[in-house]
Curated annotation (Swiss-Prot):
SMART domains reported in the protein's UniProt record: AP2
Skewed-composition ranges (Basic residues): 52-66
Protein name per Swiss-Prot or TrEMBL: Dehydration-responsive element-binding protein 2A
Broad class of the protein's primary localization: nucleus
Annotated stretches, region: Disordered: 1-32, 50-74, 279-304
Keyword entries, A-Z: Activator, DNA-binding, Nucleus, Stress response, Transcription, Transcription regulation, Ubl conjugation
Induction: By high-salt and drought stresses.
GO biological processes: cellular response to hypoxia; heat acclimation; positive regulation of DNA-templated transcription; response to heat; response to hydrogen peroxide; response to UV-B; response to water deprivation
Residues within the DNA-binding region(s): 78-135
GO molecular function, a single term: DNA-binding transcription factor activity
Length: 335
């Protein structure tokens, strides 16, 4: 800080380098953590004494900044009491009950942390009727750690870590030795696990369904093939259709009614059959070397005489001067 004298010349310069920016506080000098603690104690006292049913707080606005203002992801943020700065940081603030003033809750690296800080402040201010961004998150105590603390919470699994503010007005996690676990991250992991389980169950169900369908089609195909083969066997002819089946009893058949085909063919190729027939029909005849010689000729019997049925023999005589038959005397008709 520079000090000037009445002449306007600078005679002394004093620069205070030890001054740091204090945390934001209200006009009465109380910090945000102290104010939240007061609201929490007030709500606990009112719930114990009052018998009237309290009104549910108004929904309020969830639009955040005006359209076109704030950070690039501000328009996609739907958390209550959370908005994004143009440089990417997220801030949270809450309005006190009965249309009170707004309380600055701090700056956070993610929207989820800012939303969790808002929930803690809402629980302290409005009690069990508070409208929360994460209704299923566990309740945590709101305490005051120092004159520079903002929204301070007890570190439990699934809750927001303690936030403090440095001279540059940016919130940093309070060193507690344990990494913070946030409700949204746990919820997101559980949802992912549930989705994976559902996908696994769905894929298994689809696999079993299509396997059963394919098995049914294979059975129908095999059954159709078997029926086709049976139909072809019924339509086709077998040995039983052309001859005697193997299981037919042939004892009642007479052997004289049967003949051997091979023997018949052998007899047809030879001369024995004709010899036997001639001997049976003409006992007086003989067949020798394939030449037929009647037995009547062998004994001097004249076949012409055997054919004489009482008719006088034919005589060739010329009549009426016709000498045609005279020249035929040289023929030996008897021989």
């Amino acid at each position: 800080m520079a000090v000037y004298d009445q002449s306007g010349d600078r005679n002394r310069t004093q620069i205070d380098t030890s001054r740091k920016r204090k945390s934001r506080s209200r006009g009465d000098g109380t910090t945000v953590a102290e104010r939240l603690k007061r609201w929490k104690e007030y709500n606990e006292t009112v719930e114990e004494v009052s018998t009237k049913k309290r009104k549910v707080p108004a929904k309020g606005s969830k639009k955040g900044c005006m359209k076109g203002k704030g950070g690039p992801e501000n328009s996609r943020c739907s958390f209550r009491g959370v908005r994004q700065r143009i440089w990417g940081k997220w801030v949270a603030e809450i309005r006190e009950p009965n249309r009170g003033s707004r309380l600055w809750l701090g700056t956070f690296p993610t929207a989820q942390e800012a939303a969790s800080a808002y929930d803690e402040a809402a629980k302290a201010m409005y009690g069990p009727l508070a409208r929360l961004n994460f209704p299923r998150s566990d309740a945590s105590e709101v305490t005051s750690t120092s004159s520079q603390s903002e929204v301070c919470t007890v570190e439990t699994p699934g809750c927001v870590h303690v936030k403090t503010e440095d001279p540059d007005c940016e919130s940093k996690p309070f060193s507690g030795g344990v990494e913070p676990m946030y409700c949204l991250e746990n919820g997101a992991e559980e949802m992912k696990r549930g989705v994976k389980a559902d996908k696994h169950w769905l894929s298994e169900f689809e696999h079993n369904y299509w396997s059963d369908i394919l098995k049914e089609k294979e059975k129908q195909k095999e059954q159709g093939i078997v029926e086709t083969c049976q139909q072809q066997q019924q339509d086709s002819l077998s040995v039983a259709d052309y001859g005697w089946p193997n299981d037919v009893d042939q004892s009642h058949l007479d052997s004289s009614d049967m003949f051997d085909v091979d023997e018949l063919l052998r007899d047809l190729n030879g001369d024995d059959v004709f010899a036997g027939l001639n001997q049976d029909r003409y006992p007086g005849n003989s067949v020798a070397n394939g030449s037929y010689r009647p037995e009547s000729q062998q004994s001097g019997f004249d076949p012409l005489q055997s054919l004489n049925y009482g008719i006088p023999p034919f005589q060739l005589e010329g009549k009426d001067g016709n000498g045609f038959f005279d020249d035929l005397s040289y023929l030996d008709l008897e021989n």
